[in-house]
Amino acid sequence: MQESGGSSGQGGPSLCLEWKQLNYYVPDQEQSNYSFWNECRKKRELRILQDASGHMKTGDLIAILGGSGAGKTTLLAAISQRLRGNLTGDVVLNGMAMERHQMTRISSFLPQFEINVKTFTAYEHLYFMSHFKMHRRTTKAEKRQRVADLLLAVGLRDAAHTRIQQLSGGERKRLSLAEELITDPIFLFCDEPTTGLDSFSAYSVIKTLRHLCTRRRIAKHSLNQVYGEDSFETPSGESSASGSGSKSIEMEVVAESHESLLQTMRELPALGVLSNSPNGTHKKAAICSIHQPTSDIFELFTHIILMDGGRIVYQGRTEQAAKFFTDLGYELPLNCNPADFYLKTLADKEGKENAGAVLRAKYEHETDGLYSGSWLLARSYSGDYLKHVQNFKKIRWIYQVYLLMVRFMTEDLRNIRSGLIAFGFFMITAVTLSLMYSGIGGLTQRTVQDVGGSIFMLSNEMIFTFSYGVTYIFPAALPIIRREVGEGTYSLSAYYVALVLSFVPVAFFKGYVFLSVIYASIYYTRGFLLYLSMGFLMSLSAVAAVGYGVFLSSLFESDKMASECAAPFDLIFLIFGGTYMNVDTVPGLKYLSLFFYSNEALMYKFWIDIDNIDCPVNEDHPCIKTGVEVLQQGSYRNADYTYWLDCFSLVVVAVIFHIVSFGLVRRYIHRSGYY
Amino acid sequence: MGQEDQELLIRGGSKHPSAEHLNNGDSGAASQSCINQGFGQAKNYGTLLPPSPPEDSGSGSGQLAENLTYAWHNMDIFGAVNQPGSGWRQLVNRTRGLFCNERHIPAPRKHLLKNVCGVAYPGELLAVMGSSGAGKTTLLNALAFRSPQGIQVSPSGMRLLNGQPVDAKEMQARCAYVQQDDLFIGSLTAREHLIFQAMVRMPRHLTYRQRVARVDQVIQELSLSKCQHTIIGVPGRVKGLSGGERKRLAFASEALTDPPLLICDEPTSGLDSFTAHSVVQVLKKLSQKGKTVILTIHQPSSELFELFDKILLMAEGRVAFLGTPSEAVDFFSYVGAQCPTNYNPADFYVQVLAVVPGREIESRDRIAKICDNFAISKVARDMEQLLATKNLEKPLEQPENGYTYKATWFMQFRAVLWRSWLSVLKEPLLVKVRLIQTTMVAILIGLIFLGQQLTQVGVMNINGAIFLFLTNMTFQNVFATINVFTSELPVFMREARSRLYRCDTYFLGKTIAELPLFLTVPLVFTAIAYPMIGLRAGVLHFFNCLALVTLVANVSTSFGYLISCASSSTSMALSVGPPVIIPFLLFGGFFLNSGSVPVYLKWLSYLSWFRYANEGLLINQWADVEPGEISCTSSNTTCPSSGKVILETLNFSAADLPLDYVGLAILIVSFRVLAYLALRLRARRKE
């Protein structure tokens, strides 16, 4: 805790993030079958964080240790301001209170579960993200340079052109780390960065963090690599001086002598490149929640925080922890990993009465007054760093849409295999339909039934294929959206518009291909114009179906729930499509159904100009003589503008669905934290 | 400091005195002899003496209380190499072999285990450790005779139980193998699971009471009594047993038969340190009762490490060390890698034996040195002697009367039926959700079609409603069956592979247990929707309809079984289902007049349950509707005048009603038979 004095002198001003009295509550969920009574009952609240206070300075690498359910991740999310909900307490940077959006600028949060676009290569992913995360005026060459540096730094240069899905767990984790480093944040928050990795990958991840934190960088490339030219309108002497040097001077100072041997020997290749970072004058600070670190990993941390039951039991330098424990009579045995020992002591509820409480009492006694009084660093620092952060400009909205569309398209192209399989199923259905209906000939009473059925199957197939396709894809994308929108990478509206736009060409392509198979077998006598107009309508209904699918999946938020709960919706829509029942039996409801519009328009186009249908020989049998009568019998409208009205209605329905589901997605993102 | 030693070791540097004689000769032969001396004369690392005889070995139920020493020797294992594009290349090779009369073009192979030896004694907990890719699981699979396809165990390898070579069948009688991922039926309680296992695993002559007594005993032994009435649950979906409890339950099912040898693959993966500790503690307890326990473990914590009696360290497919942990300290400090203080020895060994990316050559050299050192140590030579001398030890008892299955056909059937019935009752997705869903959909349809009159529009709507009955029954049941059945299939595959029960008892028990549900659902549906819509009044008509709908529900269930047995996964089954159903749907006569079916597809329409049922239901509805009952305005030519006319326009005839019943019944039977055959084929193929 006390080494700040030495380091701040050499490596630029030291930044100190401090948090005070953080408390976090969640509603206590009692198991009950009757949710209504739960609503009525007075809500109890569970306190997940209790008066957590502490601080971190640049140069620290802190481990949060604790058993399951001790609140490690909650503390991490609370400090980094990524937590939504009932959080009280202050987080300040050098005495200045940090708002949520400011925190996202100066810090990065590496989530436990990596969520990346699996089909991109490592290089593509970073380059893509660098567009969003760097200043809008950054040139391509600078971005490429930065990405190459980062890849080198995290040891992924050899794997740069491997797809993410083929990377190993450790490589993915390091890639996520590289992604977070694009903005060159001062504070890094990592949630369980080693979980699921083998020992060497785990070690290399923490090692990289350690390097970021404890090495001192004297000078670096100019700041405008990230923050762009116009953030230098008010040049303060220091930054412009360092920026003017075209060649950066890199210098690494090994921070503490005792680690030299072990470090030099296990040095990861090319970590030095990270010193090229724009904020080179600042060391970073990283804080990780970590579950069962191995001995070698544990030694890399400069500080540890021990947690138990939502409280901080101990916070301080790693070396001093052993003494802290020994003072209370908990002797560290030989050949035992200290981390294991500390955790075991905390969990040992059977031995002496609650070691955790004893330890915490001692800790609170020692740090009494440290966090309750004024801030550790008074409001003195207002340096360039924050100024640059405030001047940061993201890329424009329309460019975001464009980039995201490129991403969707690339993803689809890379997944061409599964896309082709789905398309194959789709075409099999089309061929089946055309075979089944190949017996239709002439215009008889039977044809009326058959054509009605075939048209229903057409719109049915289009709408369900698209709505279910989206329902399966979209919920999986929700965590990515939540995280990236939450981190301010791009705006939700840009994402949403790009998503919808990327579906349009697919809808038109599939619509026309599907129709042409069937058209060739059933309606081929009716000419090309009908083909064009029917295909147009089917594509439109597919676009609307996408809206419907997004609506369902954003309403239920998981594909399982969505596909289970969608059944009644589907049923109603299907019934009011007009084939199962006359649409006017229940007035008004038909306007809710996508199927109705698409059915009506297709029926209209087919029947409107037919004026002679054969009657059966048996005079008793009912006979429909003209196309208009067919439409009348099904209570379809047959005015001149019916087709265009239906097209318009489909567009309106699609827009309404999209607006509603946009609102739902936004609510979802704002409701829950995204760590 | 200790770290320096490690550093030196990893670097292969030569500064440290103790490492010197390993590296002194750049000429390999000299150093070899040097090491040989060091090991052969001065030090004996690793002992092969069995531990002192266990005190209370007879505490089990008295069956199979033998103690087994398991030794393996010269195990060489090869795996198939998965090359990019090798499928095509193989094909080319094979055709070339066919035409050029070169039959044997060997596929490239990878040497996974190299000459691995070892021995495990009764009363001893042996932990196999090593970094990932060292061959831990490969060794374990080979030891349990469960190597997956594509892995070849070279015939030179020997696996000896008490000095006698064993084969797969003998091994199965004596060895319990607990796999890394445990599969359970989530809706049962822990106790119910164990009772089922006791019914099918334990020898035939035991009574039910004896079995339950054994279950109680095992529950006590593995400290499961607290959670014995908790449902097992499905991770991530249904809350149930914790990870440690699941693991202990997996041990418990194996411990029921009291096997003398227990092999566990990664029993602690995915558990936090305290749970992991309790799990290993349980294994330790079992070993103290005289069992031989072998387990692999990835990263044991310090306390866990203390529990192991012997450790077997593996690296690069070779044995790096076998012996007690304290001997390991000596051995490693001898080869120049002293474990630092305040450092978990397990972490240290694994690290020393890991291949560090970027420094592969160095690491491999280091590993080779350590392994060579061990191979010529006293231990390895002792092992040779042991294999030479111990052959005459007491021969193995013959396994109990040689049945493939422990339980009789009827006992298996009863057990499977009992379990399936329990899981039907308790699986909310099956009963509660299904019934609620059915009721809601029935009410919904009833409300939309409420009170149809016999008018021209009414006729249209009634026909639509009747067809909706069929589509709804079909899709609901097919998907429900697929979801439930495929989720249970992995459990079936594993249990069938362990020869717990026959394929036919399982299929029969499972389908019979689910039958009541598939009778109730149509009943609820018809009882609500039929009167609400106002279909043909009369008790006879109602029951006719009910019978047809019930038959449809069961045909579609059978079809669901068929699809789920024939396809490889749930998502596969779910995506294959609809395209296959659509032709049958079209043949139903609603979307396509049955007179318009093309001639060359006529035969297919006899497989369509939609056709039979739609015809039956429409006959039931319209056959006796007299002219005049349908209110038409006189001028309207498009209005059907009587029920007969309606049937005729749809190309159905009233005489076919019995045929429809027969058709549906035949479909039920044939779909089920096909499903059974598919299931059987699948169980066979996986072996």
UniProtKB/Swiss-Prot annotation, chain A:
Residues 236-248 have a biased composition (Low complexity). GO terms for molecular function: ABC-type transporter activity; amine transmembrane transporter activity; ATP binding; ATP hydrolysis activity; ATPase-coupled transmembrane transporter activity; guanine transmembrane transporter activity; pigment binding. InterPro entries: AAA+_ATPase (IPR003593), ABC2_TM (IPR013525), ABC_transporter-like_ATP-bd (IPR003439), ABC_transporter-like_CS (IPR017871), ABCG_dom (IPR043926), ABCG_transporters (IPR050352), P-loop_NTPase (IPR027417), Pigment_permease/Abcg (IPR005284). The keyword ATP-binding applies. Residues 34-261 form the ABC transporter domain. Residues 1-419, 482-497, 553-568, 666-675 are cytoplasmic. GO terms for biological process: aminergic neurotransmitter loading into synaptic vesicle; eye pigment precursor transport; guanine transport; sensory perception of sound; transmembrane transport. Coiled coil: none annotated. The keyword Thylakoid does not apply. Changing residue 638 to T: In 6; normal eye color. Eyes are brown due to a reduction in red pigment production in a w/white co2 mutant background. GO terms for cellular component: plasma membrane; presynapse. The chain crosses the membrane at residues 420-440, 461-481, 498-518, 532-552, 569-589, 645-665. It is a multi-pass membrane protein. Gene3D superfamilies: P-loop containing nucleotide triphosphate hydrolases. Its EC number is 7.6.2.-, 7.6.2.6. It comes from the Eukaryota. May form a heterodimer with w/white. This is Protein brown. It comes from Drosophila melanogaster (Fruit fly).
UniProtKB/Swiss-Prot annotation, chain B:
Residues 93-341 form the ABC transporter domain. The keyword Cytoplasm does not apply. It comes from the Eukaryota. The chain crosses the membrane at residues 420-440, 461-481, 498-518, 532-552, 569-589, 645-665. The keyword ATP-binding applies. Changing residue 590 to G: In sat; 96% decrease in drosopterin (eye red pigment) levels and 21% decrease in xanthommatin (eye brown pigment) levels. It is an enzyme of class 7 (translocase). Residues 1-30 are annotated as: Disordered. Changing residue 298 to N: In crr; 89% decrease in drosopterin (eye red pigment) levels and 81% decrease in xanthommatin (eye brown pigment) levels. ATP binds at residues 130-137. Induction: Up-regulated during aging in intestinal stem cells. GO terms for biological process: aminergic neurotransmitter loading into synaptic vesicle; biogenic amine biosynthetic process; cGMP transport; compound eye pigmentation; eye pigment metabolic process; eye pigment precursor transport; gravitaxis; guanine transport. Its EC number is 7.6.2.-, 7.6.2.6. Glycans are attached at residue 636. May form a heterodimer with bw/brown. May form a heterodimer with st/scarlet. Belongs to the ABC transporter superfamily. ABCG family. Eye pigment precursor importer (TC 3.A.1.204) subfamily. ATP-dependent transporter of the ATP-binding cassette (ABC) family which transports various molecules including bioamines, neurotransmitters, metabolic intermediates and second messengers. In the eye, required for the transport of the eye red and brown pigment precursors, guanine and tryptophan, into pigment cell granules. Probably in association with bw/brown, involved in the transport of guanine. Probably in association with st/scarlet involved in the transport of kynurenine and probably tryptophan. Involved in the transport of kynurenine in pupal eyes. This is Protein white.
